């Protein structure tokens, strides 16, 4: 995405197709103008789309031109304050919204619900939104129901879509028998936005990490399920990926657990993303392992 020729197949009608946006560029509005937005807005422009607006909560960027934010010449599109988001969307009438703000569904709910309310297709880099049904089903259903009412699509995507998802299912599809799927992935939280860094516990002392991040894993399956149903569960990224893999492969989840371990560094290290120095021995991030057992006898560990 975005595409200049969108093929729309209408259900319950004789087969026909309509080409939209033949004579104009796809109109995109950007939610959040941080590190990830610099890339997503550039990608939109490179693929022939048009960024018609941008929305942010940070007073330091409100009123700035998006060209300046991207390190380009000014483009005549200024960042709008979040409180004016609905008015901005109604005025600009975008085809697509890109939401690159936070990592948890509860934190992007308002933006996604607004898009659903106004019938604007939205895609988000929120990691939980990749497959939120197994971590926050209540909010997921709220967004899903509203999007269906207004006829738009709300979806989560990103790195995991290809490398933790489609790539694995493609390989699995060529395999005669599977007993276990095991994988690992590493990345530098400094290369991403502050939402990802905070979700990984970066900058916390080990005691803070234990209380705020790791403690959620030291509970029974029944306790975890209650927290999930309450909408307060804090999933690691692989929690949602494992759920996605099971759904895609037609596997029935019997149990799923996660364990998070802080990573540290022997010296003080400055983080431009956090805007502070992480002390030696404090958490620079985390290692998360999610293990899923299925009724079909296949284990997924990632």
Cite the ranges covered by each PLM segment.
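Short, hinge-like loop/turn segments at secondary-structure boundaries
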Residues: 69-73, 141-143, 172-174, 199-201
């Amino acid at each position: 995405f975005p595409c200049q020729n969108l093929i729309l197949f209408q259900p319950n009608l004789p087969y026909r197709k309509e080409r939209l946006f033949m004579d104009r560029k796809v109109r995109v509005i950007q939610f959040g103008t941080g590190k990830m937005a610099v890339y997503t807005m550039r990608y939109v422009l490179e693929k022939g789309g048009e960024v018609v607006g941008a929305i942010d909560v940070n007073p330091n960027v409100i009123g700035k031109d998006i060209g300046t934010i991207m390190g380009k010449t000014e483009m005549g599109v200024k960042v709008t304050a979040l409180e004016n988001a609905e008015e901005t969307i109604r005025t600009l009438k975008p085809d697509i919204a890109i939401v690159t703000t936070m990592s948890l569904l509860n934190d992007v709910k308002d933006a996604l619900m607004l898009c659903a309310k106004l019938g604007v297709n939205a895609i988000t880099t929120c990691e939980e939104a990749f497959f939120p049904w197994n971590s926050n089903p209540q909010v997921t259903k709220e967004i899903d129901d509203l999007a269906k009412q207004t006829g738009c699509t709300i979806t989560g995507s990103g790195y995991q879509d290809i490398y933790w998802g489609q790539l694995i299912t493609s390989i699995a599809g060529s395999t005669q028998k599977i007993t276990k799927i095991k994988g690992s992935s590493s990345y530098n939280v400094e290369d991403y936005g502050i939402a990802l860094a905070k979700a990984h516990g970066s900058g916390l002392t080990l005691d803070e990490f234990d209380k705020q991040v790791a403690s959620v894993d030291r509970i029974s399956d029944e306790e975890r399920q209650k927290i999930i149903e309450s909408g307060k569960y804090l999933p690691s990224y692989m929690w949602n990926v494992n759920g996605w893999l099971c759904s895609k492969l037609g596997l029935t989840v019997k149990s799923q657990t996660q364990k998070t371990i802080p990573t540290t560094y022997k010296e003080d290290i400055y983080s431009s993303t956090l805007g502070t120095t992480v002390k030696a021995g404090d958490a620079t991030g985390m290692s998360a392992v999610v293990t899923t057992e299925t009724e079909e006898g296949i284990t997924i560990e990632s």
